[in-house]
Every structure is written in structure tokens, then in C-alpha cells.
């Protein structure tokens, strides 16, 4: 028997109507972005570079610890969220106007957390005008087990612009004895000079990444890898200098350099991140002829 209050039980007590099903909670995705434009503060050859435009959104921020008379502006990217989770999308774009000079780094290692399916995405874009220079020197990226990361670096350079890029990837948290039993790391670089593609590089590690890196023909047991790329007018002619610097690195770091098509590339592999990070910092400081950004030393 029923009335407007709802269905009644056999004892005559009303049975409350069932509440509608609530939709399953969806995981909150984070979208962060920094869009930066810098230019010289004057026409002198040694005029310091200053920020012209800056837009920030989500957890990404930019800080400039040094705003002195130095020609090169130093910027530090900060992820206030502390890491990158599945489905997050982080975008950084930087424009260096003609004659400007800028070095960008990160405040700490970037952590890529385990994923329940979707990939995290990092998109970095750069444009460097005539006579400009950009040094892209983030600290290492650490992938947790079951992390899924797709990263892209794209740059457009004027005919006489300079670009130096260094990226370090760490496959698992060695301090915890972690291996990547299941993960995805896809890294895609595309560099154009005067509109023409001059450098293209793609890496894809998918599945049992640690097992893949244990293969002699792939990683020889390495858990940390670095790529350093110099696209400047003198880079190709400095190959012997680069190899001499690499020969002085510790034995546990395997490294090689090659130069062609107006640029120079360095690869490094190591069983753990500490010696590789130190080796990359030593090489870059000598190569650039100036110290690494201060956050690298903390």
C-alpha cells in the first residue's frame, strides 16, 4: 500500500524514497602555464635583459632572484603544487626579443606521480630573436613507478640566435629501491632555425622501463639520463672541447658528444642521478663559462 509519502513496509511504516545516485567524483586535473617575454633594457650591447610581459596561471609561477646589471636575466620556474599528477597539463612559453639573454631553470626536481590512466603533459616552447640567447636548464625530472609523461620541447630560432638546452630524467626513486615496472616516458624535441627544421629527437620508453633500460643496447642498467643540446654559431666547432670535458667526468657516467648541422649534442647515462647531475652541472658550467643558476647549488 502506498501514499504520497512513499512506499510502506508490511508493518505499515513508510520506507523513505531512495536518493538519486551521485555521480562518481572525478579526479581534479591541474593546468599550469607561464608565458614570458623578455627584451634588452636599452640599445647597448651589454644592456641587461628585463621582463616585458609575464602571465601565470594555475600552480606555475616565475621568480627572478637576480635583477642586477647582468646582461642575462635569470628566471626560476616554481610549481607550487609540488609535483605533476596524471592528466595535469603544464605549459611554458618564453620569447626572447632580439638581443635579449635569459636563463631559465626550476626551483627543484620535478616529480611525476603514478597515474591511474591519463598521461601528464609538459609543453615547453621557445622563440629566440636575432642575436638573442636562451639557456634552458631545468633541474631533473623524476618519474615514479606507473607514471605516464608526455613532454614536448619546441623552439624557433632566428638565424644568429643561440639556444642551450639540458634535460635530466630519473627513472624511479633509487633511495626507495623503486623500479619502473610499468610507466611511459615520451620526450619529443623539435628545433627550427629561420623556419627550417634543424633538430628532431624523439624518445619513447613504454612498459617495463627498468627492464628496457637494463638491456645493454638501450641503457646498460642506467637509471638516469641527460641530453644537452647547443645550437649556437660556434657549437659545431667546439666538439673537441666538449669531448675533453666529458673525458674528465667520473667513470660511472657514460657520456658522448657529436656535432653536425650547426649544433652539438651530448648524451649522458649513469646508474643513479647524483653522479649524473654533478657531471651535467660541471660540464654546463665549463661550457657556458659561468656558474650554474644558484638553485642548482642548494
Swiss-Prot record:
Identify the domain of life: Bacteria
| Record's GO cellular component terms | cytoplasm
**What InterPro entries does the annotation carry?**
UreD (IPR002669)
One Pfam entry for this protein is: UreD
The answer to keyword Cell cycle applying to this record is: no
Q: Where in the cell is it found?
A: Cytoplasm
Region Disordered, as annotated, extends over: 1-30
The main location class comes to: cytoplasm
Q: GO: which molecular function terms?
A: nickel cation binding
Q: Keywords on this record? A: Chaperone, Cytoplasm, Nickel insertion
Assembly and interaction partners: UreD, UreF and UreG form a complex that acts as a GTP-hydrolysis-dependent molecular chaperone, activating the urease apoprotein by helping to assemble the nickel containing metallocenter of UreC. The UreE protein probably delivers the nickel.
The job of this chain, per UniProt, is described as: Required for maturation of urease via the functional incorporation of the urease nickel metallocenter.
**Hey, which family's this protein in?**
Belongs to the UreD family.
PANTHER family in the record: UREASE ACCESSORY PROTEIN D
Q: What is the protein name for this chain?
A: Urease accessory protein UreD 3
Q: What organism does the record attribute this protein to?
A: Methylorubrum extorquens (strain PA1)
What gene name does this entry carry? ureD3
